[in-house]
UniProtKB/Swiss-Prot annotation:
This is tRNA modification GTPase MnmE. Its EC number is 3.6.-.-. Homodimer. Heterotetramer of two MnmE and two MnmG subunits. Its main location: cytoplasm. Mg(2+) binds at residues 232, 253. Residues 218-384 form the TrmE-type G domain. Belongs to the TRAFAC class TrmE-Era-EngA-EngB-Septin-like GTPase superfamily. TrmE GTPase family. It comes from Rhodopseudomonas palustris (strain HaA2).
Length: 460
């Protein structure tokens, strides 16, 4: 029997032990399994309290079950759910009983969702939205994932593809009736109007998107600078826990340390890098090389150190914010006019260096926390601006979406080339429809399905 024809089961709830656990069963034998273990099949979509017994009539649990007949279920197949007490022994006994049935096996990661996709319960963009929702760590990620799961992009792509196919049908009909007077022109005209409208809509979506697909990975902020300026102390302060070793000895941090933060609902990856300086220690040299490479890849760099060293040490096009640390060590006489957060002090320091307008500047004490709140607030504002298109207007949530929409847009634009033969217009439209079909997971996507569904947990 083909694996897709087998009935699958898995724990669909969280880690045990817990108050309750949910075991989901999907497939042709779900009905038989439920009836055999509970003694009767409950009405569809009805909660029933039952006694679950194994094939030897040994009591497993006093539990609740639900029954969903195909196709009105999450997977489009017959589905049974066992809501049992969340003890490990209870689950083990139920799993043993389920595995005793022929053609019933444990599910692979993401197999329930893949069956839902294959049975037309959701398209590939919605499946990706579900994956993003499961892995969402921040409010902004959750909002975008919920909209994608609800068909934000999928509904548009289906409509666009259907209209392209309609236009293609008109053009092909015109080709068939090319010898019938002006029939071809009469059929081509409305098709080209439709194509122009669709091209405009897709181009508008692509133009409106900023970096919304980056929400899945988050903004990358590198903390860079020479040794012993407080980089590790700052990342510990921002992480609110000890993630980096703090030592008075220069060169303590040898490797890149990463911390995930939620700033204003946006995901931010904070990177503590090795102190950038000349060194004859081969290990420290490698740390400095990695620090420079990571800073060059960052979306924002927080530079702790002398301003004149920034352009030499930091490569790449990311904006650089100058952070003057250890303001608690500055004599009181030098801090007159500084506000409680240290921003005023930062401005004074910048003015003495004659570079006040060059970059954002902050004066902080990573050790005491002075000024850190102002800097965090500014970082949250930077993240919000960076992900500006990830609000309610965002449609694209993955790079795959963008690439396929770009392909469709190019094909539609080519199809509108003045003087292009109808046969070539039809071919461009076929390619555009194919790109949208791959976006939805309806054509030629077998190579990406395993990667997408393999990210899901078992039981989803």
């Amino acid at each position: 029997m083909h694996p897709n024809d087998q009935t699958i089961f898995a724990l669909a709830s969280g880690r045990l032990p817990s108050a309750l656990a949910i075991v989901r069963v999907s497939g042709a034998r779900a009905r038989d399994v439920l009836a055999a273990l509970t003694g009767a099949l409950p009405p569809p979509r009805t909660v029933r309290r039952v006694r679950i017994r194994d094939v030897n009539h040994e009591l497993i649990d006093d539990a609740v079950v639900l029954w969903f007949a195909a196709p009105a279920s999450a997977t489009g197949e017959d589905v049974a759910e066992f809501h049992i007490h969340g003890g490990r022994a209870v689950l083990a006994a139920l799993v043993k009983a389920l595995a005793s049935f022929d053609d019933v096996r444990p599910a692979e990661p993401g197999e329930f969702t893949r069956r839902a996709f294959e049975n037309g319960k959701l398209d590939l963009t919605e499946a990706e939205g579900l994956d993003d929702l499961i892995h969402a760590d921040t409010e902004a990620q959750r909002r975008l994932a919920v909209r994608q799961l609800g068909g934000l992009l999928g509904d548009r792509a289906r409509r666009w593809r259907a209209q392209i196919i309609e236009a293609l049908a008109l053009i092909e009909a015109g080709i068939d009736f090319a010898d019938e007077g002006d029939v071809q022109g009469e059929l081509m005209a409305p098709a080209l109007r439709t194509i122009a409208t669709l091209h405009g809509e897709i181009a508008e979506v692509l133009a409106a998107q900023g970096k919304s697909e980056r929400l899945r990975d988050g903004l990358v902020v590198a903390i860079a600078g020479p040794p012993n300026v407080g980089k590790s102390t700052l990342i510990n302060r921002l992480a609110r826990r000890e993630v980096a070793i703090v030592s008075p000895h220069a060169g303590t941090t040898r490797d890149v340390i990463e911390v995930q933060l939620d700033l204003g609902g946006y995901p931010v990856t904070l990177i503590d890098t090795a102190g950038i300086r000349e060194s004859e220690d081969s290990v420290e040299q490698e740390g400095v090389r990695r620090a420079k490479a990571r800073a060059a890849e960052a979306d924002l760099v927080l530079w702790l150190g002398a301003d004149e060293a920034i352009d030499v040490a930091v490569e790449g096009s990311a904006p650089v914010w100058r952070v003057r640390n250890k303001i608690d060590l500055v004599p009181q006489a030098d801090t007159v006019g500084a506000d409680s957060g240290g921003a005023g002090l930062a401005a004074n320091l910048w003015q003495t260096e004659g570079n006040v307008a060059a970059r954002e500047a902050f004066g902080i004490s990573a050790k005491r926390g002075d000024g850190v709140g102002d800097m965090v607030e500014a970082l949250a504002g930077f993240a919000a601006q960076y992900f500006a298109a990830s609000g309610e207007a965002a449609v694209i949530s993955r790079e795959r979406h963008r690439l396929l929409l770009q392909q469709a847009e190019v094909m539609l634009r080519c199809s509108m080339t003045v003087g292009l033969a109808p046969e070539l217009v039809a071919e461009e439209l076929r390619l555009a429809a194919g790109a949208l079909g791959r976006l939805l997971g309806r054509v030629d996507v077998e190579d990406v399905l395993g990667e997408i569904f393999g990210r899901f947990c078992i039981g989803k």
